[in-house]
């Protein structure tokens, strides 16, 4: 029998100066080769931006035509080693060899289903990861209060990446609020 390592549960804090999609690609690469990875993003525009950089990804999104959505559903069901990108309903996708779930901006209001019974991606992803021993990674600029509580209780590991922001200072020449040299830069 195959020995499985203990799944990881992580929140990765990215600074605002870092492009979240480029960072997400590096996170996806870290899990590739270890089974399928499900990436859940808040909206269709985020799906399109990510898929533009991951052409081999399978898309699960309500914006697709019915036939394409069903074809992608079957690919998820029977395919192996996939990267699946979708919006909130993708959290329920029956992916054959799912190993990891990555959720971008878990506190976004677009991850919440308002119709009854109300649910959100974060809670479903946590339950699914616990039930199936999956790696669970949340990526964002700031954790929600629910995830912050899980970080505080040590159920989710917190990691932060370093970033450098280049700052230029322009002295005032005539006592103005915004230096005239800066206005020329804009």
Roles of regions detected by a PLM:
Residues 1-26, 135-186:
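Conserved interdomain linker/interface between the two RecA-like ATPase lobes of SF2 helicase motors
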Residues 5-14, 33-37, 81-82:
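Pre-Walker A (Motif I) flank of P-loop NTPase domains
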Residues 17-18, 43-47, 64-66, 90-92, ...:
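Conserved nucleotide-binding/hydrolysis micro-motifs of P-loop NTPases
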Residues 20, 24, 43-50, 68-69, ...:
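Helical mechanochemical/support elements of P-loop NTPase systems and associated helical scaffolds
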Residues 35-43, 60:
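Conserved RecA-like ASCE P-loop NTPase motor core of nucleic-acid helicases/translocases
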Residues 49-97:
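Conserved motor-coupling elements within RecA-like helicase/translocase cores
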Residues 58-66, 108-118, 171-176:
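Flexible beta-alpha connector loops of hexameric P-loop NTPases
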Residues 79-83, 88-137:
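SF2 helicase catalytic motif II
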């Amino acid at each position: 029998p195959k020995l499985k390592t203990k799944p990881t549960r992580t929140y990765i804090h990215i600074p605002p100066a870092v492009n979240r999609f480029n960072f997400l690609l590096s996170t996806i690469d870290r899990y590739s080769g270890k089974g399928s990875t499900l990436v859940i993003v808040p909206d269709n525009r985020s799906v399109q931006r990510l898929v533009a950089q991951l052409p081999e990804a399978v898309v699960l999104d309500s914006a697709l035509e019915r036939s394409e959505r069903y074809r992608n559903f079957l690919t998820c069901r029977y395919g192996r080693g996939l990267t699946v990108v979708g919006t909130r309903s993708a959290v329920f996708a029956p992916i054959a060899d799912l190993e990891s779930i990555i959720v971008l901006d878990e506190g976004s209001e677009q991850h919440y289903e308002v119709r009854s019974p109300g649910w959100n991606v974060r809670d479903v992803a946590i339950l699914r990861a616990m039930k199936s021993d999956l790696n669970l990674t949340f990526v964002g600029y700031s954790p929600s209060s629910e995830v912050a509580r899980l970080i505080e209780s040590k159920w989710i590991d917190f990691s932060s990446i370093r970033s450098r922001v280049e700052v230029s200072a322009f002295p005032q020449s005539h006592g103005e609020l915004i230096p005239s040299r800066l206005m020329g830069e804009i």
